[in-house]
Amino acid sequence: MSKSLQAIRGMNDILPAQTPTWRYLESTFAQLLESYGYSEIRLPILEFTDLFARGIGEGTDVVDKEMYTFLDRNEESLTLRPEGTAGCVRAVLEHGMTGGGQVQKLWYTGPMFRYEKPQKGRYRQFHQIGVEVFNQPGPDIDAELIVLTARLWKQLGLADAVTLQLNSLGSSEARARYRDALVAYLQQRFEQLDEDSQRRLTTNPLRILDSKNAQTQALLTDAPTLHDYLDEESRAHFEGLKARLDAVGIAYEINPKLVRGLDYYGRTVFEWVTDKLGAQGTVCAGGRYDGLVSQFGGKPTPGVGFAMGVERLVLLLETLGLVPETLNPAPHAYICAFGEAAELAALALAERLRDELPGLRLLVNAGGGSFKSQFKKADKSGARYALILGDDELAGRVVGCKPLRDDSEQQSIAWDALPERLAACLEQV
């Protein structure tokens, strides 16, 4: 096959057999978010590159290695969004949505792009559902975000498959003090660090904490911990969050090495992880970013949010057999028409039934065919009834109704009575 007729590596088609699961996940979460008072915002997938360089941070893997960046015809550097928070912050600033202390509770969904090594659960084009809250500084809103995700897991049947991990990164001043202590500790052991961690020691030392290298992790056993450097305000914020989670019975683990991969986070960070998907265990992650709005030139504005990976959640639902069987239901009926006059009548009949029976799943045979071939297609469709129109039915103003899923006899039903009779039959299913 020609390369031009193949999807780009790491960018996948989502086929009709898969889309019902996607719609189920997206609609379930959308309804949940709306019940908590969140509003949808739709954001462009292209932004100026500087937005991500300033927001995510120079020296991060995302900015240095993973962004899809190019010059447009005006020589402007543009980037396909690698995440949603920076674009959402840009939007609320551009449209004055946080002025005067306005609280904004927003959500969005769509594709993100990162040049990573494709593997199961990790792609170069991937989809996220993101949630952002502005002008709510307290631990109560941090708790709400975690509580609503816990409710989503319960609705999806995933409550026993995921674990909540928490940490506090403290204030920027506390992180700076901790960074100095960590760098001093690791510089004495520089030769024992893996190559990637050696590079990060000068660019983004906190990211060494979540290194996947076993030897580096062993070195970190006796390293200083961030909690020893937390300022009192951050410590109180974290205790307030834990108290709220305890109050609603949400279990959590404190992970002092949880730092997240984006520089804008401070204070609360959290991840929901699973051991059911191998290496790609994080299905939802987020935290607080109180300094990001001012970093973009706005007034200091508290912010907190999270994003969840749709592909990973779909994979988790499929792996655990939690995709509802009713997501792609078979048609209720299939109209078989024999002859040109019957085909015209079938079209009119179908639209009348759709008018009178909202929600009716109805297929009309297309392309003609013999009695046998049309019945074969009706049966293959999974329809419960075949509705038959031919010259005799037209002459008698009736429709043949043949049950396809049991041995019941075919009936002739008057045109005018068909909607009521068909509705009664469907109610018995």
Curated annotation (Swiss-Prot):
- What Gene Ontology molecular function terms does this protein carry? ATP binding; histidine-tRNA ligase activity
* Record's subcellular location: Cytoplasm
Reaction catalyzed: tRNA(His) + L-histidine + ATP = L-histidyl-tRNA(His) + AMP + diphosphate + H(+)
The organism's place on the tree of life at top rank: Bacteria
The GO biological-process annotations, alphabetized, read as: histidyl-tRNA aminoacylation
Where is it chiefly localized? cytoplasm
Q: Which family does it belong to?
A: Belongs to the class-II aminoacyl-tRNA synthetase family.
Q: What is this protein called?
A: Histidine--tRNA ligase
Native species: Stutzerimonas stutzeri (strain A1501) (Pseudomonas stutzeri)
UniProt lists the gene as hisS
